[in-house]
């Protein structure tokens, strides 16, 4: 069958790219939406195996939602959540489960796994469930829905979404003679502030700036500048991505800026581990950092009694934010498996999905985790209003996303080789921060990525 050959080809190309095997002999089929009465026709309790990557407090919040759903469906549906490790580990296990015919009914996959999941031909699009039920997907925040919509179809349901912000230490700004209510808007302004903040110039903190070597952060500089990170309209309109614009003028300028900041003692190279950059900011060693909205609560708690925390829209490379431009979302979404699963299992997974995104569930999820509420009506819930009153900085994220127009430049690049693209971007930045020429480093990364993209595209025809 064509589907089997495609999946086997995906296995080969992902192995060549250094990823785990994807799939084997599972027949492609059973991808249709079940009948509405599928659960009524089922005998006994229908179980939904649910693989996810939420740990610590986020995992506790997710399990609480699962328990609430199960309590409301005793004798009919039982969701069985299983933590499968971080995103990369989870998708590796998913690929192995396809090969062994043991896929979960529902899978949480990170944003950059979107095109792979579509190409795997293993999932039933959420759009199809919604159309069957006349379910209004318009309740999903437009930019978040936009990320998971490819060729006009929403394939998965966002669960945990976030956008990046510029966080800064207002107390340090005041000590350095800077206006704490006028945060930097672009890279030049960050440098100007860092020059006054950094110890090397007699400033109040060790370093003015510090952020993790994280590809998602670099991708945002294309989005906020109104530029495509990948060609083919970021892979959004049907034509496959054949090139990532890693060595574009904006990317080179960004990496050159970052390198010089480190060389001049205005920024610290904290490496790829995001926690290291977070800890440096919490400890007051750095005065500015780039991070997701998921850190609003953590940064606020760390700053309490130590310094006043500020947050601002994600910076642009130069000038001011282009009209309609803004950040693209990150996080993960939910996918419902088709092959190997009964009609009742698919329907039960859909019912659970709807429960997770209803306003009260999303208000709970938002207030417990700091992730962006994907259902816009969640912001009207009393619990969410109380949370925003206590965490007013989150309004910065809401405003930033609200004014960002949905389009190819702001929904992020969707490509089957996106995990490799992101890692390669990190490789380029990392090499530059230890002394390599930024333009040459990114040019080499561009060549390496082109091979990965071509191999993937060849595998799917």
What are these regions (language model features)?
Residues 33, 111-165, 220-224, 310-312, ...:
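Hinge/lid segment of periplasmic solute-binding proteins
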Residues 393-448:
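C-terminal capping/gating helix-and-loop segments adjacent to ligand/active sites or protein-protein/ligand interfaces
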Residues 68, 72-140, 175-177, 182-185, ...:
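Extracytoplasmic "Venus flytrap"/periplasmic binding protein-like
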Residues 150-159, 164, 174, 188-243:
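Extracytoplasmic/periplasmic solute-binding protein
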Residues 44, 176, 260-267, 301-371, ...:
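Extracytoplasmic/periplasmic substrate-recognition and gating elements
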Residues 193-196, 239-270:
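Glycine-centered hinge/linker elements that transmit conformational signals in sensory
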Residues 40, 127-140, 183-185, 207-209, ...:
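Short, solvent-exposed loop/beta-turn-alpha elements that line the ligand-binding surface or hinge
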Residues 96-97, 104-105, 133-173, 207, ...:
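A structural signal for short loop-to-beta-strand junctions that line the ligand-binding cleft
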